[in-house]
Design a protein with these regions (language model features):
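Accessory terminal regions of nucleic-acid processing enzymes
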Residues: 1-2, 119, 168, 199, ...
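Catalytic cores of nuclease domains that cleave nucleic-acid phosphodiester backbones
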Residues: 90-211
Length: 280
């Protein structure tokens, strides 16, 4: 594989420059919040199904959002048959997996239909300014690849599933929609991602980011904000100026239901994340 582009493989969600694997934005940002949240909630749901209000009374006795898992679960698990617990938890795990797989399938299908429509139309409507931006299909021999490594050479327009990579190849990611507009020599970027969560992404959470970002909820909304700001930061390293950032949430995969959530430019938080990752 040549070193003239970064490529993406969907099966393991990996990025490569030749034989060099490049960390993803998800890996960069995921180091700043606990990854056990799914496991926590699966256990919580399992105990609720087995013990009902007896467990919920215990859960509500904690005066903080998300108690430590050991403090919460250990006293209860001591009095439950391991066989019964694992039997019920397997059902919860299977339900969780089926729901996630269905959401991933439908979400991917929705993304693909939106992209194909934009290519057929020949333009994308920027949700921030309402203007039409020309789009061009860029063929790839992989699941995705960079259009060029000289990002500032890209013409103004809209870009779908744009693969971005830091100049030092320290991190890479993909953004659903990137809009480039040059005004008085300044190259502005707007970024919009498509989200199809069953519910509107929550802004609060039962957990927080890890220090030094522990003033922020580790909520779905904030994770999206950090992710999208990371794409903007990567492009800013080439000279682009982030102007408008956000994501559009669609209900039940209905294109007419989209609601744009505008995000702030989080320069301080992103610089902390990128600086810390360089020292891992």
């Amino acid at each position: 594989m040549k070193n003239d582009k970064v490529v993406f493989f969907k099966d393991d969600h990996s990025y490569w420059l030749g034989d060099q694997q490049i960390p993803s934005v998800g890996k960069f940002t995921g180091r700043f919040y606990d990854s056990f949240e799914d496991s926590f909630w699966k256990t919580h749901i399992t105990l609720k199904r087995i013990l009902g209000e007896e467990y919920m009374d215990h859960y509500r006795s904690f005066k903080k959002f998300q108690p430590d898992a050991i403090d919460l679960f250990e006293p209860i698990l001591r009095d439950i048959s391991p066989i019964e617990f694992h039997k019920v938890k397997k059902v919860v795990d299977d339900e969780w997996t089926k729901k996630r797989n269905k959401a991933n399938f439908n979400g991917t299908k929705f993304h693909n239909l939106k992209e194909e429509k934009a290519y057929l139309d020949g333009f994308l409507i920027n949700p921030f300014d309402g203007k039409k931006y020309p789009v061009t299909r860029h063929e790839s021999e992989f699941d995705n690849e960079t259009i060029t490594l000289d990002f500032m050479s890209l013409p103004d327009g809209g870009y779908l599933e744009m693969l971005v990579v830091a100049p030092d190849f320290s991190v890479a990611g993909q953004s659903d929609e990137v809009y480039i507009e040059t005004i008085d020599g300044v190259r502005y970027i707007d970024i919009n991602d498509t989200k199809t969560n069953e519910k509107k992404p929550a802004k609060s959470s039962l957990s927080y980011y890890l220090p030094p970002l522990d003033y922020m909820y580790a909520s779905t909304h904030n994770k999206y904000a950090i992710q999208i700001n990371s794409y903007a930061h990567i492009l800013s390293l080439y000279g682009f100026v982030p102007r408008n950032l956000g994501y559009t949430h669609y209900k039940k995969y209905d294109e007419n239901s989209g609601v744009l959530q505008v995000l702030p430019v989080m320069k301080k938080e992103i610089e902390i994340i990128f600086d810390k990752n360089l020292h891992f």
